[in-house]
Amino acid sequence: MFTGLIEDIGTLRELRIGGAQAQLSVNTGLPMTELTLGESIAVNGVCLTVTSFGDGSFTADVSPETLDCTSLGRLSRGARVNLERALRFSDRLGGHLVSGHV
């Protein structure tokens, strides 16, 4: 679940499309020490799962269905993207509850 409140504006580092899965890499100012593998991050409102991270960026796999149903497949290198990490039970609810699932 997400609040819909943007935490950071990242920059698309790379979008590799090929085969059954695409990979999206984003440069971000989010603290890398707070990220974990498998964490959910909303990229332009789309819930993605972190598959790797480090050096100020993270990578997530993107399914063909997600590319077809969202604007993620039309992004180009350097595009600015809105980022939000998933809501924790201890967080304040300053926005609205949204899921981000495709």
At which residue positions do the language-model features occur?
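Conserved loop->alpha-helix
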Residues: 1-102
